[in-house]
């Protein structure tokens, strides 16, 4: 079975303080210990022997780690996407992958300003990367909502958000951080539940939401148990004229938020082969479709896109299948975990242009194209308690991942006239397929040098089939200072391999001139994939101090990421065709830097009343080549929660989020936008209030008001003409959820 954990209330209380502080949420007193005992993993017990926790468990106590519990989600239910509650964690915002403002309402999870492409999403520790099936645009954006909406909120046991050095152990794509969504496991007796949720905006121009889900779980035999859940969710799109009168350029069509139609079905069969061996079999199917609101990449809508929006058409849909077998074992020498995983994503969408101003614009013929992304993954690790010199737990592990992509539509951009490019065949002769493999070995050691002094060194080696070896060393340390203070520090080298569009010489984009780099004076431009790229790397550092006494918890963490080789569409031309068109390749930029502070405060005002706050303050975030930010995020973000357990049955919560000013890019990078708008988004706040009542063990209701003071933002364009005003903030809305169970 799983490693047995010492379930002392002291360990649980420490974890409670950490989760309340870092997550900005408070749990009801009568549920705290029961829920958090499940996570008291700081001490592992093998038979009668008590040993230290693993390196992974120790790193989850680092300054850059937050926990969102099922109770947090129940008290603050997301309207549609888990990213809505994840964004309330320190260091987390929602934004695009660049400062362009394109697809401005498709905001994804950004951790410490490193952009969504540097945020790795896991479900039960397994990578989820369906967004990689969506074409990667010239400015670094994808027309996707990301990978944070594959699990219904009601089926989440907890969410772990890892930032900085603690995330580097997870390999490619985790340079910003990791979001690990842990689902609920099979129960020890037959249980079932059903939840319905509705969110009704006060303004008829904002899209409403209806959601329903069920779950069923329990034993089948003494050794066999199961869990199954399903959900259906619909969020309407915003009205097509929601931004009318607010756009900087009235001739442009600036769309609101698109709607979604989601369906999820998942099952798990858990087999306890022996008291010390458990094998889980998992399978799931999800369908995500949009309800089109009229968005185009360059806000240049047509009669065709307007008609699709008026009809509420579904212009893209994604089908995801996932299968996994997981073995967890406890042995006389330690513990083990092995995972075999396969997932595929079919991405069906109306075909879009690939050239110039019509890049990302749906074609008039309304024909669907399809791409298919497949991932094959194997991983395994051993945790070995050792007693030589110091008490320690050594972790050794290996991973293998093969990613394949078949995307004919995105590779069909042709040459102009008699142009040709070395290494890039004509459109009809290109293979639509690309692939990559990564093999990895890693070793970590969690060492107790002396009571109160922990040292966790690690080393990871990744071997990419196209880009060779990458070493990722790490070192984390923790030192208690007396009874109340703890200092924690970490440094790690993280990396991200080029994606299957950036590295594919068959992937070609074209602009007749306006979208060319600002340094060019004439001719059109081709942007082509580059199979000689280097991996992106980042040296992530953090230093934090924590104070704990009598229920009070306070912390302050400094972080800095020195980012190298970010892959971008370059400003420099590598050559010209015979007709005078410019040739560019995806290239590695030189350096960028992200730096900031994270602060936390938990105040136990009363036995049943707590106040928790977290603050993120960005000192700098910029590409040193262009001076532009890596992504547009607030100067600071303040999340605060006042949680009152009024009675055994009644709980209430008051929440607020204050966003500091958001600065746009400072410098234009393309020929048609040598000067960009300097319009900022000023400081604003979003408040919410909710209350929940438990009628019985089998029936509970919760309702609330979001955006209590109706603070709205309107999308005004892309960054070159609207600065930072590139997204909609919806207005006041009323929600209610009801859960019945047996």
Swiss-Prot record:
Q: Where does it live in the cell?
A: Cell outer membrane
* GO molecular function annotations of the record: enterobactin transmembrane transporter activity; porin activity; siderophore uptake transmembrane transporter activity; signaling receptor activity
* The TBDR plug domain, residue ranges: 57-184
Which cellular component, as a GO term, is one annotated location?
pore complex
UniProt motif TonB C-terminal box: location: 725-742
Tell me the leader sequence span. Answer: 1-28
The cross-references to InterPro entries, in alphabetical order and at most eight, read: Plug_dom, Plug_dom_sf, TonB-dep_rcpt-like, TonB-dep_rcpt_b-brl, TonB_rcpt_b-brl_sf, TonB_rcpt_CS, TonB_sidphr_rcpt
Q: Mention one GO biological process in which this protein takes part, according to its record.
A: enterobactin transport
Give disulfide pairs as residue numbers. 516-525
User: Where does the record place the TBDR beta-barrel domain?
Assistant: 189-742
Q: Which Gene3D superfamilies match?
A: TonB-dependent receptor, beta-barrel domain, TonB-dependent receptor, plug domain
Per the record, what phenotype accompanies loss of this gene's function? Deletion decreases sensitivity to siderophore-beta-lactam drug conjugates. In a pvdD and pchEF double mutant background, in iron restricted culture, able to grow in the presence of enterobactin or various synthetic catecholates, but fails to grow when enterobactin receptor pfeA is also deleted. In a pvdF and pchA double mutant background, in iron restricted culture, growth inhibited by 60% in the presence of dopamine and delayed in the presence of other catecholamines such as epinephrine; growth is inhibited further, but not completely abolished, when piuA is aso deleted.
The record's keywords, sorted A to Z, are: Cell outer membrane, Disulfide bond, Ion transport, Iron, Iron transport, Membrane, Porin, Receptor, Signal, TonB box, Transmembrane, Transmembrane beta strand, Transport
Topological relation to the membrane, as annotated: Multi-pass membrane protein
What are the Polar residues biased-composition ranges?
94-108
Q: Which residue intervals make up region (Disordered)? A: 91-112, 409-435
| Family indicated by similarity | Belongs to the TonB-dependent receptor family.
Q: Which function does this protein serve?
A: Specific receptor for the siderophore ferric enterobactin. Probably involved in the transport of siderophores, including host catecholamines such as L-DOPA.
Q: What is this protein called?
A: Ferric enterobactin receptor PirA
Write the lineage as a comma-separated list: Bacteria, Pseudomonadati, Pseudomonadota, Gammaproteobacteria, Pseudomonadales
Q: Which gene encodes it?
A: pirA
């Amino acid at each position: 079975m799983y490693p047995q954990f010492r379930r002392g209330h002291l360990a649980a209380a420490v974890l409670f303080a950490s989760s309340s502080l870092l997550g900005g949420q408070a749990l009801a007193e009568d549920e705290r210990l029961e829920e958090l005992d499940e996570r008291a993993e700081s001490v592992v017990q093998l038979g009668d022997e008590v040993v230290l926790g693993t390196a992974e468990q120790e790193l989850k106590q680092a300054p850059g780690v937050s926990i969102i519990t099922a109770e947090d989600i129940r008290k603050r239910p997301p309207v549609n996407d888990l990213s809505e509650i994840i964004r309330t964690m320190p260091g987390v915002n929602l934004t695009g992958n660049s400062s362009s403002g394109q697809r401005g309402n498709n905001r994804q999870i950004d951790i410490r300003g490193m952009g969504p492409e540097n945020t790795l999403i896991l479900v039960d520790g397994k990578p989820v990367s369906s967004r990689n099936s969506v074409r990667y645009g010239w400015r670094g954006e994808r027309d996707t909502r990301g990978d944070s909406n594959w699990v219904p909120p009601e089926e989440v046991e907890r969410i772990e958000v890892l930032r900085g050095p603690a995330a580097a152990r997870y390999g490619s794509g985790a340079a910003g951080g990791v979001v690990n969504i842990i689902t609920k496991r099979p129960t020890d007796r037959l249980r079932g539940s059903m939840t319905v949720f509705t969110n009704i905006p006060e303004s008829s121009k904002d899209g409403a939401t209806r959601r329903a889900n069920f779950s069923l779980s329990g034993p089948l035999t003494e050794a066999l148990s199961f869990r199954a859940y399903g959900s259906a969710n619909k969020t309407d799109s915003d009205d097509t004229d929601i931004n009318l009168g607010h756009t900087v350029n009235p001739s442009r069509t600036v769309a609101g938020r698109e709607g979604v139609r989601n369906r999820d079905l998942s099952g798990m069969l858990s087999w306890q082969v022996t008291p010390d061996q458990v094998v889980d079999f998992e399978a799931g199917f999800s369908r995500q479709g949009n309800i089109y609101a009229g968005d185009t990449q360059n806000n240049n809508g047509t009669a065709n896109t307007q008609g699709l929006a008026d009809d509420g058409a579904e212009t893209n849909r994604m089908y995801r299948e996932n299968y996994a077998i997981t073995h967890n074992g406890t042995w006389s020498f330690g513990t083990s975990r092995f995972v075999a995983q396969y997932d595929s994503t079919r991405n069906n969408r109306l075909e879009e242009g690939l050239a110039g101003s019509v890049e990302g614009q749906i074609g008039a013929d309304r024909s669907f194209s399809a791409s298919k992304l497949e991932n094959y993954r194997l991983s395994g690790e051993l945790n070995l308690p050792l007693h030589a010199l110091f008490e320690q737990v050594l972790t050794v592990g290996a991973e293998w991942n093969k990613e394949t992509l078949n995307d004919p539509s995105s590779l069909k951009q042709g040459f102009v006239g008699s142009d040709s490019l070395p290494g890039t065949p004509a459109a009809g002769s290109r293979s639509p397929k690309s692939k990559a493999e990564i093999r990895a070995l890693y070793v970590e050691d969690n060492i107790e040098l002396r009571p109160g002094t922990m040292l966790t060194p690690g080393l990871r080696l990744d071997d990419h089939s196209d880009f060779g070896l990458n070493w990722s060393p790490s070192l984390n340390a923790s030192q208690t200072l007396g009874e109340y203070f703890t200092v924690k520090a970490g440094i790690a080298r993280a990396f991200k391999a080029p994606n299957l569009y950036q590295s594919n010489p068959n992937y070609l984009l074209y602009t007749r001139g306006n979208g060319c780099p600002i340094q060019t004076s004439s001719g059109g431009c081709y942007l082509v994939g580059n199979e000689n790229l280097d991996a992106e790397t980042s040296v992530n550092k953090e230093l934090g101090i924590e104070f704990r006494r009598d229920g009070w918890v306070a912390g302050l963490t400094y972080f800095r990421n020195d980012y190298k080789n970010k892959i971008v569409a370059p400003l420099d031309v590598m050559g010209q065709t015979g007709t005078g068109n410019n040739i560019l390749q995806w290239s590695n930029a030189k350096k960028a830097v992200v730096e900031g502070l994270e602060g936390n405060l938990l105040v136990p005002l009363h036995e049943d009343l707590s106040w928790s706050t977290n603050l993120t303050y960005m000192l700098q975030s910029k590409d040193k080549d262009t001076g532009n930010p890596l992504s547009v995020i607030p100067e600071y973000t303040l999340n605060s929660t006042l949680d009152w357990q009024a009675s055994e049955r009644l709980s209430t919560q008051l929440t607020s989020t204050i966003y500091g000013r958001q600065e746009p890019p400072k410098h234009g990078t393309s020929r048609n936008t040598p000067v960009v708008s300097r319009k900022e988004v000023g400081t604003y706040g979003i408040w919410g209030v909710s209350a929940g009542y438990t009628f019985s063990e089998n029936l509970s209701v919760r309702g609330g008001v979001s955006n209590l003071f109706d603070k709205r933002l309107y999308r005004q364009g892309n960054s070159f003409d609207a600065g930072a005003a590139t997204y909609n903030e919806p207005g006041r809305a009323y929600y209610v959820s009801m859960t019945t169970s047996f």
